[in-house]
Amino acid sequence: MGKFLQLLSHPIELKAVIQLFGFRQPLHPGKRDVNDKELVRCYELLNLTSRSFAAVIEELHPELRDAVMIFYLVLRALDTIEDDMTIKSSIKIPLLREFDTKLNTKNWTFDGNGPNEKDRTVLVEFDKILNVYHRLKPQYQDIIKSITFKMGNGMADYILDEEFNVNGVATVEDYNLYCHYVAGLVGEGLTNLFVLANFGDKTLTENNFAKADSMGLFLQKTNIIRDYHEDLQDGRSFWPREIWSKYTENLQDFHKVKTPAKEFAGVSCINELVLNALGHVTDCLDYLSLVKDPSSFSFCAIPQVMAVATLAEVYNNPKVLHGVVKIRKGTTCRLILESRTLPGVVKIFKEYIQVINHKSSVRDPNYLKIGIKCGEIEQYCEMIYPNKQALPPSMKSLPENKFTKIVASRESIDLSVQRRIEQENFNCNVVLFGIGALILSLIYFVLY
């Protein structure tokens, strides 16, 4: 009831919920051969592990849909081994380091997880995943195997790192490296898939996948900031000591010591972590501008707009220190609908960067740095899509630069998607208007 009342108090979000579930048409509806039992089961496993990821994966272009699904399940299997504290290190570490070799087999399974491990079924039925994996194009198999090797060894290294296990993340450099292994490598693998399928520009692979890495780091850092309290309850934390030690001697004190001074210190720490995460935004916008397939674009864009909205929510927010802070469900629906084109994504980023800037307090130690960073990002958004009304009257066209070339190269793609969006809006508005007129007519009939 509370969520329904919340929606009623935000009518734009209420309309977004109705439009998303009633009128939005996926670009590529997920159609599968019901007789292909292994493939059907793999998608069932995908839904069991993550319904949100399953929803966006199932709408991908058929060329990449199965490859991305298998990529996700393989990494989920790897993560399930790494997370399970009931598996002895003598078994876990060799298994992580050699997990990529299991992809050479066709019937390998693993039943060594604890009975309460949430995603143990993925490993128990790994032979079904292998069956579909071996049907993928060899190039797609190689990409999945390569990332599995890198991630498995990265996980094993962290398990053996006593300093990390005892004291957590030490420096900002360590923070970046940890996020790279957890999320940046996923971006690298997906980028290789996009480029190989001709869905993304080849320049996405330049500079050792720097832009793809930023995409992953931006998401992971946002989650790490948001999950402070939850991670603390699990006896761990990923906030880098190099940052939090400026504000407290013990990281737990932000939650335990309930004084105005400690709360201010905790919020200041959150804000510096947000500042650090914002350093990846321009790379993320660059990356998205170079993804040309509409379904792949949405697949990449949705998590990014959720992340920037979440950053705006956690910024300068003491609630992060004592519980979970999330964006509203209605906001989520609105962001999904509005992030299907590059202009839509740029508009969303600009909106939430302005929210962050307006929430800033002059008392914050990083007030000026945050203001400068937000200004830089807003300016970057303006460079991609300038406000033509603000241009001098004498300037009839924009001078050519990298942004005008990128926008021009994808204009037909975004316009095609925009037409679909406008049709959805029209259909939704007509139905809502009709329902509203019917309700008013009934009220009039009853009263008069």
Curated annotation (Swiss-Prot):
This enzyme's EC code(s): 2.5.1.21
One Pfam family matching this protein: SQS_PSY
Gene3D superfamilies: Farnesyl Diphosphate Synthase
Residue ranges crossing the lipid bilayer per the database entry: 428-448
Catalytic activity, reaction form: 2 (2E,6E)-farnesyl diphosphate + NADPH + H(+) = squalene + 2 diphosphate + NADP(+); 2 (2E,6E)-farnesyl diphosphate + NADH + H(+) = squalene + 2 diphosphate + NAD(+)
Keywords for the protein's UniProt record, in alphabetical order: Endoplasmic reticulum, Lipid biosynthesis, Lipid metabolism, Magnesium, Membrane, Microsome, NADP, Steroid biosynthesis, Steroid metabolism, Sterol biosynthesis, Sterol metabolism, Transferase, Transmembrane, Transmembrane helix
Pathway: Terpene metabolism; lanosterol biosynthesis; lanosterol from farnesyl diphosphate: step 1/3
GO terms of molecular function: squalene synthase [NAD(P)H] activity
Subcellular location per the Swiss-Prot or TrEMBL entry: Endoplasmic reticulum membrane; Microsome
Entry's induction text: Expression is induced by lovastatin and fluconazole and is repressed by amphotericin B and caspofungin. Expression is repressed during spider biofilm formation.
Entries under CDD domains matching the protein: Trans_IPPS_HH
Topology relative to the membrane: Single-pass membrane protein
Domain of life: Eukaryota
Enzyme class of the recorded protein, top EC level: transferase
UniProt cofactor(s): Mg(2+)
GO cellular component: endoplasmic reticulum; endoplasmic reticulum membrane; plasma membrane
Task of the protein: Squalene synthase; part of the third module of ergosterol biosynthesis pathway that includes the late steps of the pathway. ERG9 produces squalene from 2 farnesyl pyrophosphate moieties. The third module or late pathway involves the ergosterol synthesis itself through consecutive reactions that mainly occur in the endoplasmic reticulum (ER) membrane. Firstly, the squalene synthase ERG9 catalyzes the condensation of 2 farnesyl pyrophosphate moieties to form squalene, which is the precursor of all steroids.
Family of the protein in this entry: Belongs to the phytoene/squalene synthase family.
Protein name stated in the entry: Squalene synthase ERG9
UniProt source species: Candida albicans (strain SC5314 / ATCC MYA-2876) (Yeast)
Name of the gene encoding the protein in the UniProt record: ERG9
